[in-house]
């Protein structure tokens, strides 16, 4: 299967800012929503070049849709891809540290 080439800014959709994600930052782990077509190598390259840091490893989770109801209407949330990026010792993403 041929992998589609994504630009660096197309790979990362947005950072995930939750209590759990904020706790993970103490372990140098940052959580991002990423493009569903992106692979681990593309995510690593995008984080390293955009934030000027060194990435140790990338874990990827495919989030399944959840059923939702609004009155009598039934539907589902969209499926999406989440990446937990672990940075090498001594690196932090300063742009994301000021958000909490």
From Swiss-Prot:
Keywords, alphabetical: Ribonucleoprotein, Ribosomal protein, RNA-binding, rRNA-binding
Pfam families found in the cross-reference section: Ribosomal_L23
Key word Transmembrane helix present: no
Subunit-level organization: Part of the 50S ribosomal subunit. Contacts protein L29, and trigger factor when it is bound to the ribosome.
A GO cellular-component term linked to this record: ribonucleoprotein complex
Family under the similarity heading: Belongs to the universal ribosomal protein uL23 family.
A Gene Ontology biological process term: translation
GO molecular function: rRNA binding; structural constituent of ribosome
Membrane-spanning parts: none
InterPro entries the UniProt entry points to: Nucleotide-bd_a/b_plait_sf, Ribosomal_uL23-like, Ribosomal_uL23/eL15/eS24_sf, Ribosomal_uL23_CS
Organism encoding this protein: Thermotoga neapolitana (strain ATCC 49049 / DSM 4359 / NBRC 107923 / NS-E)
Protein name per the record: Large ribosomal subunit protein uL23
Functional summary from the UniProt entry: One of the early assembly proteins it binds 23S rRNA. One of the proteins that surrounds the polypeptide exit tunnel on the outside of the ribosome. Forms the main docking site for trigger factor binding to the ribosome.
